[in-house]
Amino acid sequence: MADIIGGEVVTELVRQLYAVSQKTLRCRGIAKNLATMIDGLQPTIKEIQYSGVELTPHRQAQLRMFSETLDKCRKLTEKVLKSSRWNMVRQLLHVRKMENLQSKVSSFLNGQLLVHVLADVHHVRADSEFRFDRIDRKVDSLNEKLGSMKLRGSESLREALKTAEATVEMVTTDGADLGVGLDLGKRKVKEMLFKSIDGERLIGISGMSGSGKTTLAKELARDEEVRGHFGNKVLFLTVSQSPNLEELRAHIWGFLTSYEAGVGATLPESRKLVILDDVWTRESLDQLMFENIPGTTTLVVSRSKLADSRVTYDVELLNEHEATALFCLSVFNQKLVPSGFSQSLVKQVVGECKGLPLSLKVIGASLKERPEKYWEGAVERLSRGEPADETHESRVFAQIEATLENLDPKTRDCFLVLGAFPEDKKIPLDVLINVLVELHDLEDATAFAVIVDLANRNLLTLVKDPRFGHMYTSYYDIFVTQHDVLRDVALRLSNHGKVNNRERLLMPKRESMLPREWERNNDEPYKARVVSIHTGEMTQMDWFDMELPKAEVLILHFSSDKYVLPPFIAKMGKLTALVIINNGMSPARLHDFSIFTNLAKLKSLWLQRVHVPELSSSTVPLQNLHKLSLIFCKINTSLDQTELDIAQIFPKLSDLTIDHCDDLLELPSTICGITSLNSISITNCPRIKELPKNLSKLKALQLLRLYACHELNSLPVEICELPRLKYVDISQCVSLSSLPEKIGKVKTLEKIDTRECSLSSIPNSVVLLTSLRHVICDREALWMWEKVQKAVAGLRVEAAEKSFSRDWLDD
């Protein structure tokens, strides 16, 4: 398969098409459409490549014909890029040829040939057991990944995992620590890596919790010399204490073979580096190594030594000078103690931290801008909290717990709630805000301020999608991460006391069943306000009855393609926020959804990677639901029924988010009957072509976000009748070529984002947008908006850097 359609060839072709769209005005729309269509093929091509199944001659011939079409397209883009933009005759000729190629590619896609090829692959694999180094990979995962796991830029979720360590930190950066104690370690590990090709294939970094192992590993993954040595073939993965080894192994195998000819071919000895962070056991490591692939080096990062001691770097604690410099960076934003401040106090606090980077950062942030008198109390608390056994890890725990004493109750509770989420996973900021809003009756902005405060204290990290550059448009673009030691502290503090009396009932890691401790104590009610359950597949028989009369937040994490909801939800009369997240590879079917009939107080519902249950006219309305988020879901026919009145089922809905739902074709017109809707966010839904014509009924709508809806070709003119609309995002809607002519009637519009659209002109009425304060556009469209800027006082026009990039795939 790789001989027929090469993944790197397709990647390069997409790059060239985007380059053409920027250079040649006449080819812009066609080139962008072609790039989107061809780019969307890549996950499917990779699935076929990795399957290891030999295609029939007939299928190979069909794919070879398509490959020839792509090759013609590549040659044409090269000609366009080399041609002069002033040669109009040649440009017209190129446009016609490109239109012809677009027709051929579209015909291929409409025929859904690749889907049939995948079906062939599945039939073959169903008849013979697929083995590769003792892996049993699920056959249906390929089909599910193909349709359901697309991310911005049409990337599959599997490949998107590679971005986990490439995010841009908003509040704190690990890079600030480098040069403070890590340079030596970086140099030593690089020496071992560069020699590894001669013998050792497994290199190690070990050290205690909070010593900076992950920071060092991240920096090595970004290091130019390391990337150059391995030809930019570097993969960083976090394994964690309860890993999905099958999924991780499939991901590593895909990475190792993506540069080669295919599964069954002989692989040349090109260098590749796989960095495995937070590995807990040798058994896990053994299952994630591919010793039979030449040129592969594995760098394992763990608390214990899992590699030979000769090629393991033990992360050293910081000496007094290094520790003082890191501490001062955290508290004073400089490496030295400021003149006039007590050197003695700084020395005492640094001494209590015993050279531990995490302690120095967290404690330093807690003392920022505090008077010296406060520092004296901090020294006393740190000294008092030091545990008797003097182990480094328990000392870190005690020191962090001491800093939490100074947090106000809501901020401290927010920190403790983070223990409800799985280890080493990015937490969508939207989810965390929803939980805090319901627990403490906060406004969204106030909840966000609490989270930022924790970030300023180095108790969590805010990260945003790297493909947005320095700008972001909503909470959905931002995620929360937390050091595993900090999460352990949150769990430890939450699990004090008898299980029935805990305010937070949490499972520390994924288990096959509910904790035995819960079952032994289920003869009396639980007082928990927050309940978090993390399992695999659950059937009706796996649940036992629980009384949770005070529970306001329920978070269900699982990894399976089917899942029976816990029956005790029906008795949770105070439940206001429900989060259901499937971490598996394919959307799950939920069973016993009828329990929702008793959730009268539910205000926030987050569904991720599940099949949305079918709604009908008999569905019991969720009278108080304010926020509904459908992420990576299969909509199926849930919203397509003409007789279904969505407004009756969700009468008070104010915030609707639908993201990465690739089978969403349209929004039902009855959704416009929800007069309380304040925000609609439809993002990364490539098949939706139009919006309801009766949008003007949404009198409360302030935010309309339509990011990366590639087939959306127009905005309804009714949008001009929305009396409160403030923000419109149509970025990466590549088929959208114009704004409504009467857009100037939206007097309340304050911000519009048009990045990577195909706008060739803007209506004259735009100058009437007197409230417009911010426009984000491409550099090529800057001249159009600068004319508007002269007519609209106070308008700021910002040209965004291109977010389209494939460099992050190598991270």
Curated annotation (Swiss-Prot):
Residues covered by the RPW8 domain: 1-147
Pfam family, one: LRR_14
Superkingdom, natural source: Eukaryota
NB-ARC domain: residues covered: 180-242, 312-437
Keywords for this protein: ATP-binding, Leucine-rich repeat, Nucleotide-binding, Plant defense, Repeat
The keyword Nucleotidyltransferase appears for this protein: no
InterPro entries tied to this protein: AAA+_ATPase (IPR003593), Adaptor_Cbl_N_dom_sf (IPR036537), Apaf_helical (IPR042197), LRR_dom_sf (IPR032675), LRR_R13L4/SHOC2-like (IPR055414), NB-ARC (IPR002182), P-loop_NTPase (IPR027417), Powdery_mildew-R_dom (IPR008808)
GO BP: cell surface receptor signaling pathway; defense response to bacterium
CDD domains with a match to the protein in the record: ABC_ATPase
Entry's Gene Ontology molecular function annotations: ADP binding; ATP binding; ATP hydrolysis activity
LRR repeat feature ranges: 650-674, 676-699, 700-722, 724-746, 748-769
Residues noted as binding ATP in the record, renumbered to the chain: 207-214
Entry remark concerning the domains of this protein: The LRR repeats probably act as specificity determinant of pathogen recognition.
Family, per entry: Belongs to the disease resistance NB-LRR family.
Record's function text: Probable disease resistance protein.
Protein name (database record): Probable disease resistance protein At5g04720
